[in-house]
């Protein structure tokens, strides 16, 4: 039942005297009246055509089935008007319908008088931001942890201020408190897991050895494989045991550091309470009051105690904890080095066995290992492959090698041709042992394009002295080869003196082009002749035949003719 009091927007304007308790009872009645008008407006909008309603008003903002609103129509039937009202977002734009002009959105025209008649003091307290605000990204710090020093007391240290103490801690600590006791429990859990791992590995080795003994066949390859696997897991068991013991030692020594932390927390709480009492005394009693002076002295003593405890705590963290984890790092380094040696030996033996049994699988496994090692090598030396793309491609495809400890050990153990390291390619010089030893063979030339190029350099045409001993040795070898061929055939033996005579006639009768070609062959193969003379036994000049001396004289004559006529006729 409605009370006799008037509303603020009552048109009658009659003022009735009501008690304060009765005025407080008017608010729910006014709320029901607004709700009735709000639902009535939604009912009227429901009879409008869909053409008049913009697209943004056709969206369902209440996908849950339980969130519905009902209104009674003229016939008393219940009608669902859930989709007739909603709260539009800031990003959506469109004409504002009467269905959204409610007291919730602040666009109700009928209640504009009520908004105007509000107390201006209440209006000033309303937030000036829009209806929908984005939540702030930063989580507020725990302001109740320490009290700020509002008055900048010179007797108080800067460490007692709220910002300097809590700014070093992340904001996630406001959601969950993590202490060294929690970290100690985690270390104990890791140590227990490590212990469980090496115990499980011991069971695995026991089972696999029992399987090997109970098997009926005796295959040497299988037995060697089981023993190699046993070595790997034995080393890993030793590694896990050492790490588990080291973690247990760290956990035991953490008790001392946890005590320091607990003491620091207690001293911080005492200092926080003293700061609160001191701040209240300054506000209510003044700074010159005796109680304020006593509290200030208490704050100073609490501050000094807190600083001493904090100093000891920092020492325990920076020195004691560092020493404990240094022992753990040393254990990792030592055991990992032993694991690398055992693993390298296993890889060498396995690849050597695959090379003899299955060549295809051997090549695939070796290529996988090489690519994985190259990826690690390239990531350490050159993170960006665009710096040297050609070098990256050559190493990746195996054209060029790279300096890797594991691959060097594998290549040294395995007997097959592999891509050498770049340093080896530069230092090694291939020997032409299979090439026939012929004076006129230009393939044996050791001159590069800049020293012996007939187009770019005149040094190519310069005369070079040929030693008679080299010619004698060369002709003697040619004679031996021809004699070996003639023995197999039934043809008559040709006199050896005919060949030098034919060469002499050709040198004298041909034109300058042929002479230049002959000179080029002689000059180019000068270094090859020197290399060949080292490999062969030396022949004394006294044992040389008369035919060899005639050939040497013919070559000297040809050399002189070349020097005189080389530039007269163009090539």
Swiss-Prot record:
Keyword Cell cycle on entry: yes
Region (Disordered) location: 1-53, 67-133, 482-501
Post-translational changes noted in the entry: Phosphorylated.
BP terms from Gene Ontology: ascospore wall assembly; ascospore-type prospore membrane formation; cell division
Basic residues composition bias: residue spans: 23-37
Keywords from the UniProt entry: Cell cycle, Cell division, Coiled coil, Meiosis, Membrane, Phosphoprotein, Sporulation
Domain of life assignment: Eukaryota
GO cellular component, one term: prospore membrane leading edge
Biased composition (Polar residues): 67-86, 95-121, 486-499
Subcellular location as annotated: Prospore membrane
Coiled-coil zones: 469-486, 542-566
Role noted for this protein: Involved in the pathway that organizes the shaping and sizing of the prospore membrane (PSM) during sporulation. May be required for the formation of ADY3 and DON1-containing protein coats at the leading edge of the PSMs during meiosis II.
Assembly: Interacts directly with ADY3. Probable component of a spindle pole body (SPB) complex composed of ADY3, SSP1, DON1, MPC54, SPO21/MPC70, NUD1 and CNM67.
Protein name: Sporulation-specific protein 1
Gene (name only): SSP1
């Amino acid at each position: 039942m409605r009370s006799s009091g008037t509303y603020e927007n009552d048109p009658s304007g009659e003022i009735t005297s009501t008690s304060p308790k009765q005025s407080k009872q008017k608010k729910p009645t006014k709320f029901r009246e607004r709700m009735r008008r709000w639902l009535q407006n939604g009912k009227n909008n429901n009879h409008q055509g869909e053409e008049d309603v913009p697209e943004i008003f056709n969206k369902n903002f209440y996908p849950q089935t339980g969130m519905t609103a009902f209104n009674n129509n003229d016939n008393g039937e219940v009608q669902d008007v859930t989709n007739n009202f909603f709260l539009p977002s800031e990003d959506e734009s469109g004409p504002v319908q009467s269905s959204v002009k409610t007291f919730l959105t602040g666009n109700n025209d009928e209640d504009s008088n009520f908004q105007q008649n509000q107390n201006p003091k209440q209006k000033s307290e309303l937030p000036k931001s829009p209806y929908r605000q984005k939540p702030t990204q930063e989580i507020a710090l725990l302001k109740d942890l320490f009290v700020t020093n509002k008055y900048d007391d010179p007797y108080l240290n800067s460490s007692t201020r709220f910002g300097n103490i809590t700014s070093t801690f992340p904001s996630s600590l406001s959601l969950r408190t993590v202490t060294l006791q929690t970290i100690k429990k985690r270390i104990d859990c890791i140590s227990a897991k490590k212990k469980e791992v090496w115990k499980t590995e011991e069971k695995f080795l026991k089972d696999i050895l029992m399987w090997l003994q109970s098997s009926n066949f005796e295959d040497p390859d299988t037995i060697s494989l089981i023993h190699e696997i046993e070595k790997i897991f034995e080393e890993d068991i030793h590694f896990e045991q050492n790490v588990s013991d080291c973690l247990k030692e760290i956990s035991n020594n953490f008790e001392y550091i946890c005590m320091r932390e607990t003491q620091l927390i207690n001293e911080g709480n005492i200092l926080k309470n003293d700061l609160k009492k001191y701040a209240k005394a300054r506000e209510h009693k003044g700074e010159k009051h005796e109680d304020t002076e006593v509290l200030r002295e208490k704050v100073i003593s609490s501050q000094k105690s807190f600083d001493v405890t904090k100093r000891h705590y920092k020492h325990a963290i920076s020195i004691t904890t560092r020493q404990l984890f240094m022992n753990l790092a040393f254990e990792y380094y030592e055991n990992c080095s032993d694991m690398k040696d055992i693993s390298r030996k296993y890889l060498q033996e396995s690849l050597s066995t695959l090379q003899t049994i299955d060549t295809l699988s051997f090549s695939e496994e070796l290529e996988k290992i090489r690519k994985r090692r190259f990826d690690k090598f390239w990531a350490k030396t050159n993170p960006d492959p665009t710096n040297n793309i050609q070098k990256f491609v050559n190493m990746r495809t195996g054209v060029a090698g790279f300096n890797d400890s594991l691959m060097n050990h594998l290549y040294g153990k395995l007997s097959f041709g592999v891509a050498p390291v770049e340093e080896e390619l530069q230092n090694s010089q291939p020997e032409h042992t299979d090439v026939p030893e012929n004076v006129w063979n230009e393939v044996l030339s050791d001159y590069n394009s800049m020293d012996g190029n007939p187009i770019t350099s005149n040094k190519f045409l310069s005369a070079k002295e040929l030693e008679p001993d080299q010619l004698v040795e060369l002709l003697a070898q040619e004679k031996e080869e021809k004699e070996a061929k003639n023995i197999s055939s039934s043809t008559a033996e040709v006199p050896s003196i005919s060949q030098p005579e034919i060469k002499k006639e050709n040198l004298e009768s041909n034109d300058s082009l042929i002479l230049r070609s002959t000179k080029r062959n002689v000059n180019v193969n000068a270094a090859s002749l020197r290399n060949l003379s080292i490999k062969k036994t030396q022949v004394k000049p006294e044992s040389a035949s008369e035919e060899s001396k005639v050939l040497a004289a013919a070559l000297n004559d040809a050399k002189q003719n070349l020097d005189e006529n080389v530039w007269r006729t163009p090539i």
